[in-house]
């Protein structure tokens, strides 16, 4: 699913060199994009050339300094001073104190605060969307849409704040009531990845807040400016409502900060979005202390198109799901299974559609396809294409690094591989689509389920019986099981997450709120009698 940024993606400078770095001559400082007139709007988000990456009611940071880069041209944007372990300890302490205030506020009033956060985000949606596009690399419409998703989740959470609760159940004993009580966990740690630096935090943050928790956020180092800008907006809302800023804290940092959160018993729930490999390490650290974790990990998603599929739906769905966000979505389609009777036609039409994709600067509203996030991602793309060729695949479209400033690669289609080729079962976070022929429903359902991940899946068919078999116990084993729509994109009203090596976590809608709370079963005796088991009586 979502990958954590690696250390290679950022320039790290020891804290001892901090003053020297931040007192560079003006000529050198002007190389940062934030100093260029066309990026002056960054200052409207409260950003500057040197930014503090810790917030716990006040801004600070005593850790290393990193520089974040624009994936479209690999130019430096600005610098961020990350959290030290001392900053982390101070932030945890302040967050815990803030919880004592936040937990006493009635849930509907907490919902009102979350609604105000959504309103504040809405006012900055264009600027934040541009920042997401600049620092992450996704096209502008996707960057704005991601902020809109956070706004929508705030609206959803505000309504949900009046509905959370447990049932009253029939008691077996006369004069007794049986009920469920739901209470907040306390401190929710949120570790997000680079590819959705706003929305995934929003899913967790909005629901965690209305359920009575405080939050500590560690975003990906390569999208630190997004984390800071979003936190500044939230902090203003909290300040205006006379609430402690530590209700929504931030500690920018790398793997050391994530490890500290995973091992810290004071973090009552850790929501982690990233690779399966790192997620497994996180899960083991949290489980070792009998903590709670919410994992959103790898996805190796498939679309299946049967002989009766409406190709006017299949083609745009496959295109959108394969190349959207340059193949860096957790729900990106990576495997396309086509019935043998339509395989050749669909591949030819897909190749034609790929040739019309407009590539360029992601903040240009006319562009549909932007860069990969880092140079490392480009290297992984090249390696995957070569592995696919060695395993018998044929690149029928793309497959090369583009001669373009930044981290651009060609959207790629590969045919001729067997369904269980090693490269097919390996998730590569890049726009590579593996296409296969199949003969019948039974075999293709098995192929869909044979990968270790289980996030998203979709079939295209008009056969009602097949649709319900797909949705049933012998159909898709994924957490998202679609019909006649792409694998990518998810409505906030449904629970988002996957099975198997995807981690089993659920975020956003439906009853995902339960993961942020603890349940108590309560028996209340409102009579004067005390019936005991097995008919025991006290004389």
From Swiss-Prot:
Keywords on record: Acetylation, Cytoplasm, Mitochondrion, NAD, Nucleus, Oxidoreductase, Transit peptide
Location in or out of the cell: Cytoplasm, Cytosol; Nucleus; Mitochondrion
Gene3D superfamilies recorded: Aldehyde Dehydrogenase, Chain A, domain 1, Aldehyde Dehydrogenase, Chain A, domain 2
N6-succinyllysine: residues carrying this PTM: 86, 94, 97, 537
Reactions accelerated catalytically: nonanal + NAD(+) + H2O = nonanoate + NADH + 2 H(+); (S)-2-amino-6-oxohexanoate + NAD(+) + H2O = L-2-aminoadipate + NADH + 2 H(+); betaine aldehyde + NAD(+) + H2O = glycine betaine + NADH + 2 H(+); an aldehyde + NAD(+) + H2O = a carboxylate + NADH + 2 H(+)
GO-annotated biological processes: glycine betaine biosynthetic process from choline
Binding site for (S)-2-amino-6-oxohexanoate: 331, 489-490
Enzyme class: oxidoreductase
Family annotation (Pfam families): Aldedh
Sites bearing N6-acetyllysine, chain numbering: 86, 94, 97, 462, 500
Bilayer-crossing regions: none
GO cellular component: cytosol; mitochondrion; nucleus
Family that this chain belongs to: Belongs to the aldehyde dehydrogenase family.
Subunit structure: Homotetramer.
Protein name as annotated: Alpha-aminoadipic semialdehyde dehydrogenase
Organism: Rattus norvegicus (Rat)
């Amino acid at each position: 699913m979502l990958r954590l940024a690696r250390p290679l993606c950022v320039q790290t400078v020891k804290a001892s060199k901090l003053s020297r770095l931040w007192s560079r001559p003006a000529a050198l400082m002007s190389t940062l994009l934030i100093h260029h007139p066309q990026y002056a709007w960054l200052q409207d988000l409260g950003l500057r050339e040197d930014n503090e990456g810790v917030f716990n009611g006040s801004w600070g940071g005593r850790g290393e300094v990193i520089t974040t880069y624009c994936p479209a041209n690999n130019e430096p944007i600005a610098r961020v001073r990350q959290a030290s372990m001392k900053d982390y300890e101070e932030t945890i302490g302040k967050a815990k104190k803030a919880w004592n205030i936040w937990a006493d506020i009635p849930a509907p009033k907490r919902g009102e605060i979350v609604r105000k956060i959504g309103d504040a985000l809405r006012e900055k949606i264009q600027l934040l969307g541009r920042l997401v596009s600049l620092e992450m690399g996704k096209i502008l419409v996707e960057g704005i849409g991601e902020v809109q998703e956070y706004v929508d989740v705030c609206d959803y959470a505000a309504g949900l704040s009046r509905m959370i609760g447990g049932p009253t159940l029939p008691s077996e004993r006369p004069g007794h009531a049986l009920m469920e009580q739901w209470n907040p966990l306390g401190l929710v740690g949120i570790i997000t990845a680079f590819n959705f630096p706003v929305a995934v935090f929003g899913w967790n943050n909005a629901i965690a807040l209305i359920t009575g928790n405080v939050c500590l956020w560690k975003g990906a180092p390569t999208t630190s400016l997004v984390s800071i800008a979003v936190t500044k907006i939230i902090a203003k809302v909290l300040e205006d409502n006379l609430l402690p800023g530590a209700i929504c804290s931030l500690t920018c940092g790398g793997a050391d900060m994530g490890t500290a959160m995973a091992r810290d018993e004071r973090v009552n729930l850790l929501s982690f979005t990233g690779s399966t490999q790192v997620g497994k390490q996180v899960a083991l650290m949290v489980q070792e202390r009998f903590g709670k974790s919410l994992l959103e990990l790898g996805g190796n998603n498939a679309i299946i198109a049967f002989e009766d599929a409406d190709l006017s739906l299949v083609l745009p769905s496959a295109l959108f799901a394969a190349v959207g966000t340059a193949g860096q979505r957790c729900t990106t389609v990576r495997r396309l299974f086509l019935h043998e009777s339509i395989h050749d036609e669909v591949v030819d039409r897909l190749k034609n559609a790929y040739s019309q994709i407009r590539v360029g600067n992601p903040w240009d509203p006319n562009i549909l396809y932007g860069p990969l996030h880092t140079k490392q991602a480009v290297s992984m793309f090249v390696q995957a294409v070569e592995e696919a060729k060695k395993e018998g695949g044929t690149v029928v479209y793309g497959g090369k690094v583009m001669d373009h400033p930044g981290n651009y690669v060609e959207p790629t289609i590969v045919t001729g591989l067997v369904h269980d080729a090693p490269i097919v079962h390996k998730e590569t976070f890049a726009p590579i689509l593996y296409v296969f022929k199949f003969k019948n429903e039974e075999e293709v359902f098995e192929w869909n389920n044979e990968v270790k991940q289980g996030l998203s899946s979709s079939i295209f068919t008009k056969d009602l019986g097949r649709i319900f078999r797909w949705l049933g116990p012998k159909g898709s084993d994924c957490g998202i099981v679609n019909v006649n729509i792409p694998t990518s994109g998810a409505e906030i009203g449904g629970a988002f997450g996957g099975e198997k090596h995807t981690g089993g976590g659920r975020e956003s809608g439906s009853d995902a709120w339960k993961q942020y709370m603890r349940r108590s079963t309560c028996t209340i005796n409102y009579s004067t009698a005390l019936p005991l088991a097995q008919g025991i009586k006290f004389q």
